[in-house]
């Protein structure tokens, strides 16, 4: 894939849970390190499933990160000689993240964002649609549906082993005890509002 050398850009990695988004983000961070680029990694403070200080994939791969409360804190921690900014679980940030990512890219940096493109209801998640719109590069990766084995593009939330209702809170931090990857056909949302 062509990468501009004379200006910044935005990369967005999206997909359902268990598709390897954080793993891909970590891979890109490690490649930037091999290229001897200065990198800063951020994650939302709310994501403390595996670690408070690291971006961690479900496979156990990890990279050190700064956990922040809101997107504006990225600017507080931003170091002028940084060449690459990586942000995991970007869907949990406020809408201002789009403006901040754009500002950093316009200053000549590479910005890599990873996150869920849809919430458990199958609806666009937080600032992700806007980030995808401004990005130069978007990778939508799939998981495997745990029900039928087909490619999965959705995240199924489970509460006591049953699909969560449409009106349940959108944000619930969890892992395998609360979520599964599902395909369109096997994704179930009780009481979903029909068009």
Swiss-Prot record:
Pfam families: TK. InterPro entries: P-loop_NTPase, Thymidine_kinase, Thymidine_kinase_CS. The keyword Cell membrane does not apply. Substrate binds at residues 120, 179. NCBIfam families: PRK04296.1-1 (NF003296). One of its GO terms (molecular function) is thymidine kinase activity. This is Thymidine kinase. The lineage of its organism: Bacteria, Bacillati, Bacillota, Clostridia, Eubacteriales. It is found in: Cytoplasm. It comes from Clostridium acetobutylicum (strain ATCC 824 / DSM 792 / JCM 1419 / IAM 19013 / LMG 5710 / NBRC 13948 / NRRL B-527 / VKM B-1787 / 2291 / W). Zn(2+) binds at residues 145, 148, 183, 186. It catalyses: thymidine + ATP = dTMP + ADP + H(+). PANTHER family: THYMIDINE KINASE, THYMIDINE KINASE, CYTOSOLIC. One of its GO terms (biological process) is thymidine metabolic process.
């Amino acid at each position: 894939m062509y990468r501009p050398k004379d200006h910044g850009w935005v990369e967005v990695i999206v997909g359902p849970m268990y598709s390897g988004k954080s793993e891909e983000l970590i891979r890109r961070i490690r490649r930037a390190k091999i290229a001897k680029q200065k990198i800063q990694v951020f994650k939302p403070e709310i994501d403390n499933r595996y670690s408070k200080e690291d971006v961690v994939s479900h496979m156990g791969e990890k990279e050190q990160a700064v956990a922040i409360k809101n997107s504006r804190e990225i600017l507080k921690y931003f170091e002028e000689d940084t060449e690459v900014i990586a942000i995991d679980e970007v869907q949990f940030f406020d809408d201002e993240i789009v403006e901040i990512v754009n500002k950093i890219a316009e200053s000549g940096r590479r910005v890599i964002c990873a996150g869920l493109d849809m919430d458990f209801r199958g609806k666009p998640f937080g600032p992700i649609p806007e980030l995808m719109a401004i990005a130069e590069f978007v990778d939508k990766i799939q998981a495997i549906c745990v029900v039928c084995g087909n490619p999965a593009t959705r995240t199924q939330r489970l509460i006591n082993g049953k699909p969560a209702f449409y009106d349940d809170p959108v944000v619930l931090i969890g892992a395998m005890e609360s979520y599964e990857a599902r395909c369109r056909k096997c994704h179930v949302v009780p009481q979903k509002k029909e068009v």
